[in-house]
């Protein structure tokens, strides 16, 4: 009789950073996400200077925004976004870019970590904003939470739109490619049997 182990082997898609295709990118991504929250929550306990805690938290939020937008999104899920401004008209529009699904395989673990963290972090900041309002704490703390909300929600909305755009363009490409192949094949077969 075989003895079954109590610890099953980790499967791709489990929340285990060792299964990541890009473990360093994933750990840096999660590190920036959690360090800003931890500095906001516990910074005053370790650093007595409020201004220093505010500045460090703000720098961690900016680093998280930059790293997620320019590095983690591209490496972990193959998505990237940016905002372009037309100099002549002053209009701005968002540009979304995704890797080709036929040439790049996204690891299920990376995808789960990315999307879970992307949606959980703004929810945590919303909870902290509600607590700051209820406690009637300093306006400066509330302003820091507002900045955190703006940065995290911007990335969340942009990557959600980018993912939707990516799925739609993949569907359109498959339909277009399939339609072209069917038209060519139908045309050739039609000519052969005329």
UniProtKB/Swiss-Prot annotation:
Localization annotation: Golgi apparatus membrane
Recorded family membership: Belongs to the TVP23 family.
Protein name (Swiss-Prot/TrEMBL): Golgi apparatus membrane protein tvp23
Pfam family, one: DUF846
Domain of life from the UniProt record: Eukaryota
Biological process per Gene Ontology, one example term: vesicle-mediated transport
Upper lineage: Eukaryota, Fungi, Dikarya, Ascomycota, Pezizomycotina
Membrane topology (UniProt): Multi-pass membrane protein
Entry keywords, A to Z: Golgi apparatus, Membrane, Transmembrane, Transmembrane helix
